[in-house]
């Protein structure tokens, strides 16, 4: 289990605020049974979401394409 840093994730998203929104929405999806794109390794959903963002296996379009996910801003 590798440590995930904010800097690793910021290479894939525009800013810290977008990172918080996307990672929290993805963590919620994982908690509700969404299929992870990486090996789980006993991580919590929040860590898994950050790992997926850092590894660029998911992006904004993937997270927001879930019909149960509310609009990004407003």
From Swiss-Prot:
A GO biological-process term: DNA-templated transcription
Enzyme class name: transferase
Matching SUPFAM superfamilies: RPB6/omega subunit-like
Enzyme nomenclature, EC number: 2.7.7.6
Keyword field: DNA-directed RNA polymerase, Nucleotidyltransferase, Transcription, Transferase
GO CC annotation: DNA-directed RNA polymerase complex
InterPro entries xref list: DNA-dir_RNA_pol_omega, Pol_omega/Rpo6/RPB6, RPB6/omega-like_sf
Family annotation (SMART domains): RNA_pol_Rpb6
UniProt cross-references to Pfam families, sorted A to Z: RNA_pol_Rpb6
GO molecular function: DNA binding; DNA-directed RNA polymerase activity
Record field: catalytic activity: RNA(n) + a ribonucleoside 5'-triphosphate = RNA(n+1) + diphosphate
Family listed: Belongs to the RNA polymerase subunit omega family.
Matching NCBIfam families: rpoZ (TIGR00690)
Its job: Promotes RNA polymerase assembly. Latches the N- and C-terminal regions of the beta' subunit thereby facilitating its interaction with the beta and alpha subunits.
Quaternary structure (record): The RNAP catalytic core consists of 2 alpha, 1 beta, 1 beta' and 1 omega subunit. When a sigma factor is associated with the core the holoenzyme is formed, which can initiate transcription.
Name of this chain's protein: DNA-directed RNA polymerase subunit omega
Native organism: Hydrogenovibrio crunogenus (strain DSM 25203 / XCL-2)
Native organism taxonomy: Bacteria, Pseudomonadati, Pseudomonadota, Gammaproteobacteria, Thiotrichales
Gene that encodes the chain: rpoZ
């Amino acid at each position: 289990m590798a440590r995930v840093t904010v800097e690793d994730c910021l290479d894939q998203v525009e800013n810290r605020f977008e990172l918080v929104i996307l990672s929290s929405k993805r963590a919620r999806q994982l908690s509700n049974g969404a299929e992870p794109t990486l090996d789980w390794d006993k991580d919590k959903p929040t860590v898994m979401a950050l790992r997926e963002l850092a590894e660029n296996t998911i992006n904004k379009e993937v997270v927001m394409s879930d019909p149960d996910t509310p609009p990004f801003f407003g």
